[in-house]
Amino acid sequence: MTSISNVSKGSIIRFKGEPHIIESLIHRTPGNLRAFYQANMKNLKTGRNVEFRFSASESVDVIVTERKPYQYLYKDGTDFVMMDSGTFDQINVPEITLGTSSRFLKDGITVVIVFSDDGSILDVEMPTFVEVEVTETSPTTKDDRATSGTKPAIVETGAEVGVPMFIQTGSIIRVDTRTGEYIERVKK
């Protein structure tokens, strides 16, 4: 057990018996009241966001974690099969662990899997940006290229991304895996 003041963003704690990752932690001292920490956390088992107010003197149980790089191989039902880059061991990761960023998983991409002290998978950290090929989008006309705005495009992983009008089928684009937004066109 450690004081809440020693915990920071990204720490994984055991809260009400389940693992939660701290997404933001703000120290507040309102007027003549006692200081507290306002925490926004994500339940790693259910994926739900939780907001809680800890008193400044409160202690929390920090989970000791290990982070290891794994390579994505393929999807097997509702699980994703990943391979340890060093030992070539394969593990199955449930789809709920990845959340919405799983729609940008493509063969060979490297992710970081966070394991708890008991060996269970707590979280999967995707790369912030991923480069994908546009496989389907509406054709552009000369007039479309002159205007700003977006159009829907299907990328190689099957996800739909809003892209600028000048993007065509076969273009390589960079996408933010956290939000699913188009970042830029990649020139190769």
Swiss-Prot record:
Cited SMART domains: EFP (SM01185), Elong-fact-P_C (SM00841)
Main location: cytoplasm
GO cellular component: cytoplasm
Pathway: Protein biosynthesis; polypeptide chain elongation
Pfam families (alphabetical): EFP, EFP_N, Elong-fact-P_C
Record's subcellular location: Cytoplasm
InterPro entries the UniProt entry points to: Elong-fact-P_C, NA-bd_OB-fold, Rib_uL2_dom2, Transl_elong_fac_P/YeiP, Transl_elong_KOW-like, Transl_elong_P/YeiP_cen, Transl_elong_P/YeiP_CS, Transl_elongation_fac_P
Keyword line: Cytoplasm, Elongation factor, Protein biosynthesis
Gene Ontology molecular function terms on file: translation elongation factor activity
GO biological process: peptide biosynthetic process
PROSITE patterns: EFP
Annotated family: Belongs to the elongation factor P family.
NCBIfam families found in the cross-reference section: efp, PRK00529.1
Entry protein name: Elongation factor P
Organism the protein comes from: Chlorobium phaeobacteroides (strain DSM 266 / SMG 266 / 2430)
